[in-house]
C-alpha cells in the first residue's frame, strides 16, 4: 500500500462535524476509497454496513466506534458467543443455526434431535430487536407456531435463533449504555414479559442505585476487555442474586432513557472528542 499523508478527519455521521463528510448511504466509489486512505481518523454512524466498516478499518488506523465484536459475531447468536468467550454470567442458552437443527434427526451426521430446556423458555430470532422476534414459549403449540415464523424468515435468508433459560418473576431489567468512556444506566419496568420502552416499558433512573452501580461496573469491565465503546447492554438481577445476568448487546438503541436524542448527541460529541484527543 502506498504511503499517504494522513491529515484529515472524515465523518460519516451526520451530527459529527469533521474536515470531510461523506454520507455512508451514498455511492461507494474510488473517490471514497481515496478519501478514506487520507484519513487519520474516521467517525461512523451506528447504522454503518459491515462491508464499509471493514473497509475503513483496513485503510485507516483509527475508527470510531469500535464495532469489531459487533461484526465478528452479529445478532443474538453473536451475543451468546461473546458471553461464552468473555465468561460473563448469562442465562443458559442453546444456539440453533437453522430450524432443521431442532427438528431434524440427522443420524448420518450423528445429530439426534436436541433436548430442549423446560417450558417456559425464551426464543429469540438471530436478528431480533426492540422486543420483535422475542417470544416466551410456554408449550409445544407455541413452539411449533414460532418455528413456522422462523422457517419463513429462512426463506428470506435470515437464519438462526437461540433458546434461552427463562428467569421468572422479573418486573424490570437494567439498560446500561456505553458512549465512549461514559457509562449510564436506568431500569426498564413492565409487568409483562417484555420490558422494552417501545413495547410499553417505563423508565426508572432513581431506584436501586447500588445494583445500577454493580451493573455499570460489570458492563465496563466487559467493554474494557472486548473493545466495545458504543452500545447498550440489557442485564437482569434474579431474586437473591446480586450479580447480574447479561441478556443482550444492542448496537443501535433507543435514547429515551438517556434524555432523548439531543442529550445522546451531546454525549456522543463528548465521547468522539475524547477519543480523538486520546488517539491522535
Task: Label each PLM-derived region with a short phrase.
Residues 60-65, 195-204, 248-254:
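Short glycine/proline- and charge-enriched loop/turn segments
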Residues 210, 224, 228, 237-280:
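C-terminal active-site "lid" helix and adjoining low-complexity regulatory extension at the edge
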Residues 121, 162, 184, 231, ...:
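Protein kinase-like catalytic core scaffold
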Residues 70-161, 213, 280:
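Active-site nucleotide/adenylate-binding loops and adjacent lid/helix of ATP-dependent enzymes
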Residues 2-103:
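Conserved N-proximal alpha/beta basic substrate-recognition cap immediately N-terminal to
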Residues 175, 234-236:
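Short, surface-exposed charged micro-motifs
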Residues 47-50, 69, 182-183, 191, ...:
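Short glycine-enriched loops at secondary-structure junctions
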Residues 132-222:
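Phosphate-binding site of ATP-dependent enzymes
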Amino acid at each position: 500500500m502506498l504511503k499517504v499523508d494522513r491529515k484529515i478527519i472524515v465523518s460519516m455521521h451526520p451530527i459529527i462535524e469533521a474536515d470531510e463528510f461523506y454520507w455512508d448511504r451514498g455511492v461507494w466509489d474510488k473517490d471514497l476509497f481515496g478519501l478514506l486512505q487520507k484519513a487519520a481518523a474516521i467517525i461512523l454512524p451506528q447504522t454503518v454496513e459491515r462491508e464499509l466498516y471493514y473497509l475503513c478499518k483496513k485503510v485507516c488506523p483509527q475508527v470510531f466506534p469500535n464495532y469489531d465484536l459487533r461484526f465478528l459475531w452479529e445478532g443474538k447468536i453473536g451475543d451468546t458467543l461473546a458471553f461464552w468467550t468473555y465468561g460473563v454470567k448469562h442465562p443458559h442458552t442453546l444456539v440453533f443455526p437453522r430450524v432443521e437443527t431442532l427438528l431434524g434427526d440427522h443420524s448420518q451426521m450423528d445429530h439426534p434431535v436436541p433436548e430442549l430446556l423446560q417450558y417456559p423458555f425464551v426464543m429469540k430470532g438471530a436478528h431480533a430487536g426492540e422486543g420483535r422476534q422475542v417470544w416466551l414459549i410456554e408449550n409445544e403449540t407455541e413452539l411449533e407456531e414460532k418455528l413456522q415464523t422462523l422457517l419463513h424468515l429462512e426463506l428470506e435468508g435470515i437464519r438462526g435463533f437461540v433458546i434461552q433459560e427463562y428467569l421468572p418473576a422479573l418486573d424490570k431489567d437494567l439498560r446500561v449504555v456505553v458512549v465512549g468512556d461514559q457509562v449510564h444506566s436506568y431500569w426498564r419496568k413492565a409487568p409483562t414479559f417484555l420490558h422494552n420502552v417501545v413495547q410499553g416499558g417505563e423508565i426508572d433512573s432513581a431506584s436501586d442505585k447500588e445494583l445500577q452501580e454493580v451493573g455499570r461496573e460489570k458492563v465496563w469491565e466487559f467493554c474494557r476487555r472486548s473493545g466495545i465503546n458504543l452500545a447498550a447492554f440489557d442485564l437482569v438481577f434474579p431474586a437473591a442474586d446480586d450479580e447480574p445476568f447479561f441478556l443482550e448487546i444492542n448496537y443501535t438503541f433507543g435514547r429515551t432513557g438517556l434524555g432523548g436524542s439531543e442529550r445522546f448527541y451531546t454525549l456522543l460529541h463528548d465521547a468522539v472528542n475524547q477519543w480523538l484527543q486520546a488517539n491522535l
